Amino acid sequence: NLYRRYGKNYLDRAAEMTIKRMDKWGLNTLANRSDKTIYDKNRKAFILPLENIGFENELMGLMDVYDNGIEKKMDEAIARNVAKYKNNHWLIGYFIGNEPAWISKENRLCSLILNGKDRPIKTELQNFLKESGDTPDTRKTFIYKTFEKLMKAISKSLKKNDPNHLNLGIRYGYIEQLDDELLRISKESFDALSFNCYALSPDHEKMNHALEISGLPMIIGE
């Protein structure tokens, strides 16, 4: 349809039309995962997602941070992500992930790891449970410890490869999921607390509590 409307240069002309509409509607920021043809016009502020940096479906959105080679691979992937935009003044920052699937399912994730292939995170978990006991609470503690280690590694890499822009967090699925420990980890790792909201409005009481614990500005991703 765009080709039929605009002809061969339809991408550029459609991008121009989008910017005109945003101006008319009073919108000043492009949404996450908008078309890069529009980003590259450099006429509206925008946000980028970090892509393909190593999150694993097998680990419900974590990485095996106990693998000696994983941080190097992740760092190289982040460097590739930010190379084009690290000096772009229109970029606000990066979402480093989206809706971690393991939150509130830490026990299940530990079972997946223990029943899965031999790998460093499995060995680390086995040793941790042997020392601390195998309970739902100790399993949750291990996953939180792993998540914190991963978030700090990503934050360090992002600041090294692009010190000019913000780490906008991991777009938690629901602010209601976030206990005080996750808020503390977020405070130590992110420049903003991002979450998605599928209700008509977010829970203001939960937002106030999140602000009290994390001290971070908040952004609703979707």
Report each predicted region and the residues it spans.
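Glycoside hydrolase catalytic-domain groove-lining segments
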Residues: T141, K145-K156, K160-E222
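Active-site-adjacent substrate/metal-binding segments within catalytic domains
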Residues: N1-D40, E56-W90, G133-K145, G221
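Short, hinge-like loop/turn segments at secondary-structure boundaries
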Residues: L48-P49, D64-V65, R184-K187
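Loop/turn elements at helix/coil->beta-strand transitions in domains of secreted/extracellular proteins
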Residues: D23-T29, N42-I47, N87-G93, D162-N167, ...
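A cross-domain feature marking catalytic cores of carbohydrate-active enzymes
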Residues: S34, L48-L50, I96-N98, G169-Y172, ...
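Short, compositionally biased "basic patch" segments
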Residues: N1, I121-K130, T146-L150, S155
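Flexible loop/turn segments at secondary-structure boundaries
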Residues: T37-Y39, F55, P100-S104, Y174-L178, ...
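Aromatic- and acidic-residue-enriched segments that line the glycan-binding/catalytic groove
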Residues: D40-G54, H89, I96-S132
